[in-house]
């Protein structure tokens, strides 16, 4: 439940910040009449992401066992790529993003009689990107942790992000977004490492990967996945009490370079947003 909550909170907050920046700029430049056009783009993006998620989730249940394992492995790999890109993209986000959004709004509103649709599409693509990232991650997370709690966590995370987005827009709160994105990014790298190990396990069960399947270690006597804490660790980080050598290797092969890259200072001119 916690991982879907955190991911949807983060992704939802990113989308909320984009919408908030656009809405604030429209209001500041006395073009508030375009607000309804902006919300059309937001709703279209939300409908696309929701529809795609439901379609994929419903159709995969009809796959034979091996094909389903293969699909789960592919989704996990896509989720790892998306999460990693999301973490390092955010590190490169600077205050120029606000300027770029404002320039994009100006450009969209200056395209003659069709400026309304131009703004709709601009907002649509900006929000849909965040939503599509969430779709693939949630598909991987729901496969790793079944039951009602992961979807509930995702909905709570999204609802929290929406509330925070409105409060930020109205000026009711100020958040240290730099610290928020920094610590959630670090957490997400560990989640992605667990997904990477889970992808190898899924590919093995699909019959595609049969190398290094010896048990690396057995922690069942110390931290069983049948215990409360073990279940939480499995749901959050993909913990396995008796992982194979290939799962452990993939976990380290992904995580160590990712942590090193994350610890390095961002390139000059690319500083993360501090607050809003």
Curated annotation (Swiss-Prot):
GO CC annotation, single: high-affinity iron permease complex
Matches recorded under Pfam families: FTR1 (PF03239)
Q: Give the source's domain of life in one word.
A: Bacteria
Membrane-side (Cytoplasmic) residue stretches? 23-35, 91-118, 169-179, 266-276
Q: Per its record, what are the GO molecular function terms?
A: ferrous iron transmembrane transporter activity
Segments in the Periplasmic topological domain: 1, 57-69, 140-147, 201-244
Spans traversing the lipid bilayer: 2-22, 36-56, 70-90, 119-139, 148-168, 180-200, 245-265
**BP term (GO), one:** iron ion transmembrane transport
> Among its keywords, does the record have Protein transport?
no
Can you say where in the cell this protein is located? Cell inner membrane
Keyword Ribonucleoprotein tagged: no
Q: How does it sit in the membrane?
A: Multi-pass membrane protein
| Keywords, in A-Z order | Cell inner membrane, Cell membrane, Membrane, Transmembrane, Transmembrane helix
Principal location: membrane
Oligomeric and partner information? Part of a ferrous iron transporter composed of EfeU, EfeO and EfeB. However, this EfeUOB tripartite iron transporter is defective in E.coli strain K12 due to a frameshift mutation in EfeU.
Q: Belongs to which family? A: Belongs to the oxidase-dependent Fe transporter (OFeT) (TC 9.A.10.1) family.
Q: What is this protein called?
A: Putative inactive ferrous iron permease EfeU
List the lineage, top down: Bacteria, Pseudomonadati, Pseudomonadota, Gammaproteobacteria, Enterobacterales
């Amino acid at each position: 439940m916690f991982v879907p909550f955190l991911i949807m909170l983060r992704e939802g907050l990113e989308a909320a910040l984009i919408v908030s920046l656009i809405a604030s700029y429209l209001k500041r430049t006395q073009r508030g009449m375009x607000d309804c056009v902006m919300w059309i783009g937001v709703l279209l993006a939300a409908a696309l992401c929701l529809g795609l998620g439901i379609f994929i989730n419903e159709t995969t249940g009809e796959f034979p066992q091996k094909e389903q394992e293969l699909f789960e492995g592919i989704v996990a790999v896509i989720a790892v790529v998306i999460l990693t890109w999301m973490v390092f993209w955010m590190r490169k986000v600077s205050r120029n993003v606000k300027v770029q959004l404002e320039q994009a709004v100006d450009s969209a509103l200056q395209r003659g009689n069709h400026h309304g649709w131009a703004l709709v599409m601009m907002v649509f693509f900006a929000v849909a990107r965040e939503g599509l990232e969430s779709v693939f991650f949630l598909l991987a997370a729901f496969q790793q942790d079944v039951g009602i709690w992961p979807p509930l966590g995702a909905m709570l995370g999204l609802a929290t992000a929406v509330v925070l987005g409105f409060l930020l827009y109205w000026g009711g709160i100020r958040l240290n977004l730099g610290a928020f994105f920094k610590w959630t990014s670090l957490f997400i790298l560990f989640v992605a490492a667990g997904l990477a190990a889970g992808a190898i396990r899924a590919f093995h069960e699909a019959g595609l990967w049969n190398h290094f399947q010896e048990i690396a270690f057995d922690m069942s006597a110390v931290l069983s996945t049948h215990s409360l804490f073990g279940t939480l660790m499995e749901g959050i980080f993909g913990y396995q009490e008796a992982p194979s050598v290939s799962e452990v290797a993939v976990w380290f092969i992904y995580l160590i370079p990712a942590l090193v890259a994350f610890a390095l200072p961002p390139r000059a001119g690319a500083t993360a947003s501090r607050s809003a």
